[in-house]
From Swiss-Prot:
Single GO biological process annotation from the record: L-leucine biosynthetic process
Quaternary structure note: Heterodimer of LeuC and LeuD.
UniProt EC number: 4.2.1.33
Family that this chain belongs to: Belongs to the LeuD family. LeuD type 1 subfamily.
Keywords: Amino-acid biosynthesis, Branched-chain amino acid biosynthesis, Leucine biosynthesis, Lyase
Pathway: Amino-acid biosynthesis; L-leucine biosynthesis; L-leucine from 3-methyl-2-oxobutanoate: step 2/4
NAD in keyword set: no
Residues of the signal peptide: none
Function: Catalyzes the isomerization between 2-isopropylmalate and 3-isopropylmalate, via the formation of 2-isopropylmaleate.
GO cellular component: 3-isopropylmalate dehydratase complex
Protein name: 3-isopropylmalate dehydratase small subunit
Highest taxon of source: Bacteria
Catalytic activity: (2R,3S)-3-isopropylmalate = (2S)-2-isopropylmalate
Amino acid sequence: MKAFTQHTGLVCPLDRANVDTDQIIPKQFLKSIKRTGFGPNLFDEWRYLDVGQPNQDCSQRPLNKDFVLNFPRYQGASVLLARENFGCGSSREHAPWALEEYGFRAIIAPSFADIFYNNSFKNGLLPIVLKEEEVDELFQQAEATEGYQLTVDLAAQTVTRPDGKQYGFEVDAFRKHCLLNGLDDIGLTLQDAEAIKAFEVRHQQSQPWLFGAIK
């Protein structure tokens, strides 16, 4: 998993509340057994004018020019600004996969659905909860200023505006450690690989009957 320490990026303001995971990545794309390839289908039903299908060449599809992610000024955005209850709905992990693959590193909102919030940390995506009035301020600035960027510092737990004003945010210490060091569940387990191997050796020596061939 890619570590997150500090990131400065273009902000895309998605001014919609209660964005659910089916809107983030529609159900027809969940058939894939891989965790890659979802970026082109992020917000598929909003980004395109046709109905998307798995393995479709999205470069040939008609774009919805009224959707914010398609505005030329927000191309290359890596910080998503959202409204309350972002990521609600089903627990599909494909939602943070699609956001991360598109290029988003952080999402700022007044609140997140719990499962989406947890899944984001496990996939290198930083969900940041700010006060509603702070999010309102950021929406006003991002919509008024082309090329608007924010700097997110996970170690310091701050979001910094271009004018220098900072907002602090809370994050669980364990999640912070994992994201700073790029550790997902597998990475955490592999840190104890030698201890696991040693246990397996001791276990096989102390209870060899468990490892005998079945006749």
